[in-house]
Amino acid sequence: MKKAILIIASFAFLIITLSAFNDRTTAPGVGYNAPDLFLTSGDNVSSLKDYKGETVLVTFWSSGDALSRIRCNEYSALADRDDRLRHIAVNFDSNEALFGEIVKRDNLTASEQYHVDGERAAQIRLNYHLDRGLHSFLIDKNGVIVAVDPDVEHVNNAL
């Protein structure tokens, strides 16, 4: 009996010890490291890892999803007013010309806007679990997601 208790206690100690030293898994949820994101715009190639040490708001949007488009506009205006926040907006429209027109019409900051389609869009949707809707992720200076679809007040409090 003592041997069985010792084995169970040793196993429990081993599990607790190993879990204490594991890094957080990368996943698109609060408390997890944000999945990396590689984006291109013209000759410019950007990665989410390039923004380590900064607070970043990643917005996924489309012209067909009104809520995501409204959020993109709000977050873009917020980032324009506060230098402590970096905004990366990723658009999934199938028509890149439409994307360009919306950026102009909505007076969005073009340098923070990226258009993706095809396989690249499918991979991003998979990595960020966007199969049930487009979301925004507030990422802290350590690359950890601190909020999903935050309101402006939440973003301001995180800065």
Predicted regions located by residue number:
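N-terminal "domain-start" segment that seeds a small globular fold
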Residues: N22-L48, A158
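Structural microenvironment flanking redox-active thiols in thiol-disulfide oxidoreductases
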Residues: L67-D106, R120-R125
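Active-site-proximal beta-strand/loop segments in catalytic clefts of secreted hydrolases
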Residues: F60-S62, V90-D93, V116
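Short active-site neighborhood of thiol/selenol oxidoreductases, capturing the structured segment around
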Residues: S46-I70, Y75
